[in-house]
Structures are given as C-alpha cells and as structure tokens.
Amino acid sequence: MAGNDCGALLDEELSSFFLNYLSDTQGGDSGEEQLCADLPELDLSQLDASDFDSATCFGELQWCPETSETEPSQYSPDDSELFQIDSENEALLAALTKTLDDIPEDDVGLAAFPELDEGDTPSCTPASPAPLSAPPSPTLERLLSPASDVDELSLLQKLLLATSSPTASSDALKDGATWSQTSLSSRSQRPCVKVDGTQDKKTPTLRAQSRPCTELHKHLTSVLPCPRVKACSPTPHPSPRLLSKEEEEEVGEDCPSPWPTPASPQDSLAQDTASPDSAQPPEEDVRAMVQLIRYMHTYCLPQRKLPQRAPEPIPQACSSLSRQVQPRSRHPPKAFWTEFSILRELLAQDILCDVSKPYRLAIPVYASLTPQSRPRPPKDSQASPAHSAMAEEVRITASPKSTGPRPSLRPLRLEVKRDVNKPTRQKREEDEEEEEEEEEEEEEKEEEEEEWGRKRPGRGLPWTKLGRKMDSSVCPVRRSRRLNPELGPWLTFTDEPLGALPSMCLDTETHNLEEDLGSLTDSSQGRQLPQGSQIPALESPCESGCGDTDEDPSCPQPTSRDSSRCLMLALSQSDSLGKKSFEESLTVELCGTAGLTPPTTPPYKPMEEDPFKPDTKLSPGQDTAPSLPSPEALPLTATPGASHKLPKRHPERSELLSHLQHATTQPVSQAGQKRPFSCSFGDHDYCQVLRPEAALQRKVLRSWEPIGVHLEDLAQQGAPLPTETKAPRREANQNCDPTHKDSMQLRDHEIRASLTKHFGLLETALEGEDLASCKSPEYDTVFEDSSSSSGESSFLLEEEEEEEEGGEEDDEGEDSGVSPPCSDHCPYQSPPSKASRQLCSRSRSSSGSSSCSSWSPATRKNFRRESRGPCSDGTPSVRHARKRREKAIGEGRVVYIRNLSSDMSSRELKKRFEVFGEIVECQVLTRSKRGQKHGFITFRCSEHAALSVRNGATLRKRNEPSFHLSYGGLRHFRWPRYTDYDPTSEESLPSSGKSKYEAMDFDSLLKEAQQSLH
C-alpha cells in the first residue's frame, strides 16, 4: 500500500510540475529560469509536451512513444551498420523530399550558410555519437539564442515532432508560420538529440529502400556551386545502404574524426535564427532544414564510409595535411614491426637450420633482426610533409640464393635497411646500385662455394659422392663421427662486410686444394677476410670426438695446444673480442646438448682424456701407411698461419694401420668390411656392430687362420704363414707335412661347399646362434662378436678330442673336413686361442677377433684338465661361454646322449636330432680312458629338448647300440663334484677326497656336534 501511495503521489506531483512548466513556457525567460532554479539537476531544455505522459515519464527522452521499448545500450556506436533509416524516418525523408523538390537550386547556395562568410571553422564531431546525447546547459543556450516574443512552434519542430503524420507535416511546412525565439532557444539541441536517440534505439537491419529516399539522395548528392561550401561540407550520403563498394573502400580513414560537419546543430540553428535581418522565415527554415539533413546523414555514416576529402587545402581539422600525416609518422616502427614477422620470413626461406635452437649456430639468426640505420653520409634532402615517414625495408636472404632443391651452404643473412629522407630518384639510383653489387657478390660466393664443394677431397663419407651436397651449416654438439656420419667438415663463419652495410652476414670461407693438399690459396682468403673478424664456428663433432682434425685451412688455429680442438663459439660480434677463442668448458655450456641422446662420453670431458685413444703408440711417420690408399689417411699439410702440430689420426684407423703394417698380406678390400672395435667403451659403440659377408665367412671357417693376427702371434702358435710372408718359423713347425699350406688353402673351398650343402646358406645357419648369444642376460661384452662366444661349433670339438687317438680320429677329421692336418708326429696345434686370446684381451679391434674363440670352451676345458695346453680359463670369452652353457642347462635345453657308436660324428648326430627342432650346439666327445663316445645337443627351445629325450632313442640304426638320453651338462668332466651322478664308480675319484663331515649323515653330525660342545 505504501508503494502504491508513493507512486500515485509522485505521479500527481510530476503531472502538476509538467503542467506548470508547459504553462510557463509562454512567459519567456523568467519561467525557464524559475524552473531551472527549482530543479537545477534537471535539464529541461529538451522537454516537450508530446514527450510526457504519466506512464513513461521515468524512461529516457523519447522522440516517439513507439520506440521506448528498445534499449539504446544494446548497440555500439562503432557498429558500421548501426544507423539505418527505418519506417518512421522514411516518412520524415519523404516529407523533406517533397518539400525540397519545390525549392529552386539557386536558394541552396552560400547564402544558406551565413556562418561560412564570417570565416568560422567548424570543429569535427566526435567519432562516437554519445557526446552529442549530452544536453547543453541552459546558460549556454541562452548565450547562443537571443530571446524572442514569438510563441508558436517553428516549422522545423512541428515537422520533426509529427513524424507519424507526414501529410500534416508537409502542410505545416507550406504555411510558413513564424516561430518563437524563446522556444527555439530552449529546444535548439532537440533535432540532434532526436536523431541520436532514434539511431541508438533502432535495430540495424537492412530494409528495402523506397523511392523518395532515392530522390532525396539525388538532391543531396548534387554538386554545390560554391567550392568553399563543397570543401566545408562534403557530399553526404543519406544512408550506408546507398553506398557502393567502391565508395566504401575509398572512404578517408586517415581522418581522426569520422565525418566533417558544417556546424554543430545548436550553433547552426542559433546563428541562422540570430540574424535580425531575416525577413523570410520560411526560407530560413528551408536553409536550416537542408543543413540539418546534411548533418544528419553525414553523422549516420560510419568511419569507413565517409566521403573522400576535397583536394583543396582548406584549413579544416579533418582535411589538414598535417593532421593526416601525423598519425602515421608518430610511431612508424610500431606499425612496421606489427607487419613484419620473424617466423614468417624464416619459414619463407629454404634454410636448413632449426630456428628454435639458435644456440646451435655460430651466430644466431635473431641477432640480426634489430633494425639498424644505414650509415650513409647525410645529404641535403628535405622531405616534403607527405614523405616525412621513414621507409624501412627488411630483407632476409640466404647467401647464396637457393636456386633449386640444393640447400644453401651459408646460414641466414638478415639485412635491415632504412632510408631516411631521401629523394625518390636518388633513393632509387642508390638502391639499384646496391642491388647490383649484392647480386655480383652473391654470384661470386656461389661460384666459390661450388668450387669448394668440387675440390674438397672425399672423406669416404656418403655425402662426398656429390660434390655440392653439404647438408647443413648447423653443428650439433656431438663427439663421434660414427654417430653423425652425415655431418660435414668444419664450417667457419665470418662477419662479412658488404660495403657500408653493417648488417650481419654469416659466410663460409672457401679454400682450394687443387695443387697440394693443405695449401691454401691466398686469393679467396684475401678477398674474404680483410675487414671482418673471423668467428670460429662450432667444431664439427665428428672431428673433435674422434681425433681426426682434417681442418679447414681457413679456420684460425689458436696458439694454445690445450684449446686447439675445443668447441668455440663467438659470444659477440664486436671488434673488441676479435679472434679470441674461449675456454672449452664455457663454450660447451653455451652450446648446450638439448634434444640429444646423453652420450657415455660426456661432451665436457677434456680432449686429453680421449676415450678413443689407441693403446698402440704410433709415431707420426706411421700415420701414412702405403697399404691403405684411402683419402682418410691423407693428412693435410700444416699452413704457415696454422699451428704446426700434426693432425691427430683417427684412433681406430691408427690401430687398424698398426695391424696392417704387421699383417701385410691382408687384402685391402677386407680392411673396411668389419669396423675394428675400440679398446674401450665409447659413444654407443654397441650400436655399431657390423656384420659384413666376410665376418660371416670367418664365423663358419673358424679352423682357418685368423685374418688380422700379428706376425709374432702367428709364429708363437706355429701356424702356417701365407706364401707372401717370409718370416721364420719355429722349430716345432718343421716336422709338419710340407703340403700343409696347400691343403689348408684348398680345404677352404671344400669346407665352404660341404657346409653350404649340409647347413644351407650362411645367414640362415648362423642366425639362430647369433640370436641365442644376444638374448642371454649375461651378454656383458657388447663389442664381442657372437661368433667369439659361440665357438662351440659342432664340427670342431670331436676332431680336437680325437687327435690323440690316431688314425681313426684322422679319418673322422677328414670326414668332417676341418680337422688340423698335422699327424701325431707333429706337435698338436695348440688352440689358436692362446695368442689370439692375448690379442683379444689387449684389443678387440683386430679384424680377427671373431676367430679368437674358434675352439670350444668345453674343449679348452678338456685340454686344461688333461694338461695338454697352458691355456687359461679366465678369459672373458670362456667365462661367457660357460655362463651361456649353464643357462642352457638350467632351462632344460641341453640333452646328454651316452652310448654312441664309435663312428658317430657330430655332424651325423646333429643331422639325426634336427627332426625334433632347431639345434644351437652339437658336440661329440670321446672318453680318453675307455674310448666311448657321448654327445651334447643344445636345442633352442626346451620343448624340443624334451621331445628329443622322449623319442631320441628311436633314431639309432640297427647295428648301433641304444642311445641313453637324459637332461645333462658337463658332469663327466667334473669328477670331484659329480661322482654320485656318474654311471660307473671306477670313473670317480677315491672318496678320501671328501672331508670327514661330508661322509657323515645327519645323526652322526648331530652326535659329533654334541660331543664337541662338552
């Protein structure tokens, strides 16, 4: 109830207030002053009788009651399609068009705008229509509008207030009644407010255009006769809908204000009505209406649809040249850098570098992106105001230019140019000259690079087959050539000056090796290095880690021996640093190794602790061996400017050369078949185990002499030397058969033929054995060839065991084709494992390492048990073989076969038992005391072994004794420990070998313990 009473009371008070106001408006200024004094916070100058009613008085100021439900806050004044002509405005425009058609064109001239004669410069209307919504104070209107005694409403106000009845408005316009100056003073802002309010409230929807609006558009776009009027109020448009595409694009966007207006509404209307000489009020109304329409439809235009500026230099705020240029020239770098994108320019070029890792370059590409002014001599070139903005040009080129799929040899070059206040013609001439010079320089560099790629000697790497295929100018921080074989040699980047241009340019130095290797042609160096300081780039990791310093002759050599091969990175390109080389620890930290697999050899390890350092000490004269005609062994001669320290050879090559000097009979073609292993563990050397065809052949032909064994080793073991070798032999070797050499070499072909016939191809026969050796968890020697540890070949053990037995063993050896040809008179050929084991334990880099363990570990053990050789059981290969055998026994894959016939060979036994599954190892051993034979068969799968144990007895022939099969191991060679498992008691040693407590049972041990306590 209280709320309703208050609402009713408020309605009554407001109604009485508005009635008093409407009655006092006829009284002139006194009534208005009284109302303003009573309610100073309300601006009543915009109120009218048609605007009020008790229901909607709390709403906003309205033009028409129908538009009160639309909220103006939902529209943004910046919307380009905000101001549209709706149905009500179409009615207004129809009335105005009908009125304007009757007006002769002579009346619409300079006389219609008297304020222009006085030289007034109207100010630009703000971009947003919101400030125009604010009503001016009554005091300001009082100053602008003098008082008048006329009481009737003006013709323009009647027309605008009666928008719903266009016919009545047109009739009222023809009457030409006089209007009150006081009423005009209190409502001079009203047309602007009505336009603003309506435009804010209407939905920006496109509607069909009516014909009267088209006629009004024709009239309003007619060319005015006076140029000053044309310049002051440019050709307006009634609606954004009537603009074409071309006009939308040609709108002047550089004017800070969205449109020019002849004058603000209050000024124009007040000054039109302020002249006391106006004798024809209808004519003044027409002028004011024309001015209002021009203002309204220019005000409705968005910023991009404004008409173009007039070319005449009228002192206007919008068309002023200084105002046009000022927004552009105020912050030119900001506009420039918003358009310039580093990543876009980098991706546009075909650059073989990772731009996200600038630390991998000698000079990061981002260091050149700072715009630098060109240091040209200042010339008297006063630029006009139109050319006051400085033009900047950023060129990103790769030197030389990429002319196809061939990658560029030089890294990115960024050239930032800035032309400051140059005349157009002079600037063009200078640019053309500079472009010609740059093109000539780039052509020269390209020719030099092609010559550099052609004349650089091949290094045996894949990319040297194509002379110009230099893959990259980025050197990741690695230390091994084996891990990065595709990386090229050192690339030295220099800071190349191009005339007076200080922009950075990374360039590779070229060198010529035509006449003499290592000699540097002074022409290319003198042409490239007179001014720029050499900046040593990252040293190629394949050179630094492996010790092969086939250095680029143009690379500067530091005087210090310690830092001669360290990684060097230029921290700055300033002249103060010059050619200073930095410490290794600092530069590696700066380079970083992000994204790389952590190597076992740390990159920060000093060069003196080279993990690839060979054990064999070589003199400098031994670096060039005549037996290895490879380009890799050709060192570059030291240049006068470089250090006189001889380049350090690759350790693996050096070790290989040392072996080749002793074993000169090794064909050169086999030297590169298998990579010699390093003595120590290096960068992922276990990934580099190669298996060429020669290695597979050596694996099968284990009884043959090792390929790369030293002469002294061959002499120690009494092995026959090849024909080319004239070294003396031991006396023990003189009793051998004279046809020993020929039979060895001839038997090679026989062995290969027989093995291929029986086992098939070499790869398939050896595949299973290799997999078995690699799957073992005890496979702790990663460099060791699987053939070294899997020397338990089936066709060697039996013949080695039967050497002492005489003719039967010799015949059986001939049957197998691999038995040593020496008879009983010839001292037995000790297993080549003694000498070759020493070689293997010293260094596994010998190419004959696969034949080090060519004799079975079990056979070695048998020899050791019977004191037939001084071979040691502690070599890694023997321990490894024992572990593998124990693992196979534990998995149940070893089958022990007893009671074999005397003529049974390992080949025959394996052939019979292959029906159960794949056999990894087959041995036939002879008991020396009794002459009985037994065998061991190791299957790959335990299921196959179990099947052979169950059904293996059925494989015997009629004249053969029955087989006794069981799971077993090498128990018969371990009598002290396995006496209880032996089939016969006489084979066991006397039981006295046992201790006292081992022979006692538990009760006896308990009694003995109790007695000892007392």
From Swiss-Prot:
The keyword RNA-binding applies. Ubiquitous with higher expression in heart, brown adipose tissue, brain and skeletal muscle. A motif (LXXLL motif 1) lies at residues 140-144. Residues 178-189, 264-278, 317-327, 520-534 have a biased composition (Polar residues). The keyword Transcription regulation applies. It is found in: Nucleus. The modification Phosphoserine is found at residues 145, 148, 384, 519, 630. One of its GO terms (molecular function) is nuclear estrogen receptor binding. Residues 128-138 have a biased composition (Pro residues). One of its GO terms (biological process) is positive regulation of cold-induced thermogenesis. Transgenic mice overexpressing PPARGC1B exhibits increased expression of medium-chain acyl CoA dehydrogenase. They are hyperphagic but lean, with increased energy expenditure and resistance to obesity. Plays a role of stimulator of transcription factors and nuclear receptors activities. Activates transcriptional activity of estrogen receptor alpha, nuclear respiratory factor 1 (NRF1) and glucocorticoid receptor in the presence of glucocorticoids. May play a role in constitutive non-adrenergic-mediated mitochondrial biogenesis as suggested by increased basal oxygen consumption and mitochondrial number when overexpressed. May be part of the pathways regulating the elevation of gluconeogenesis, beta-oxidation of fatty acids and ketogenesis during fasting. This is Peroxisome proliferator-activated receptor gamma coactivator 1-beta. It comes from Mus musculus (Mouse).
